[in-house]
A protein has these predicted regions:
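Residues lining hydrophobic/aromatic ligand-binding pockets adjacent to catalytic sites
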Residues: 1-148
Length: 148
């Protein structure tokens, strides 16, 4: 069983310099954007087209948007806008991933050298951490996860 190195990162509460330096230092080869909407204005450098350009230019890093790994609008809205409970959000998102059968629809090799991107600065209350934990459980602990 081959181990797969994967990172996660959030782009808020950081500068563009710090964001890109962390990716480069970690040796990230591909950023997988797991946001529901990848046109966020929360940070100027994180808008989809701009981000893809900067990643390629700064570090030769590929970019892809993977909405399969994003929560639905309803799940996200209940937590963010309506100040919902994290445990409810977590339970609903884990159920959504199971319903979507993400462990069968994604190949582990897709995540090798990749970094899951979302807006949250820390992974504690972010779905990118839940994605890694869910897949690690389904893929027999193959993922070696580092939160940048």
């Amino acid at each position: 069983m081959t181990r797969i190195d994967i990172s996660t990162i959030g782009f808020t509460k950081t500068s563009a310099e710090n964001f890109f330096e962390r990716l480069l230092k970690a040796g990230v080869r591909k950023v997988i954007d797991v946001r529901l909407h990848n046109t966020s204005q929360l940070a100027g450098f994180a808008k989809a087209e701009d981000l893809a350009y900067f990643l390629k230019k700064v570090g030769g890093i590929d970019y892809m948007h993977q909405p399969l790994l994003a929560p639905t609008y309803d799940i996200l809205n209940a937590f963010k806008k309506q100040k919902g409970d994290w445990n409810v959000y977590q339970r609903r998102f884990l159920s959504l991933m199971a319903e979507r059968d993400i462990e069968s629809r994604l190949k582990p090799d897709l995540l090798s050298g990749a970094c899951l991107l979302c807006s949250e600065d820390k992974p504690h209350h972010c779905h990118r951490r839940l994605v890694c934990e869910y897949l690690n459980d389904k893929w027999d602990g193959r993922l070696v996860v580092k939160h940048l």
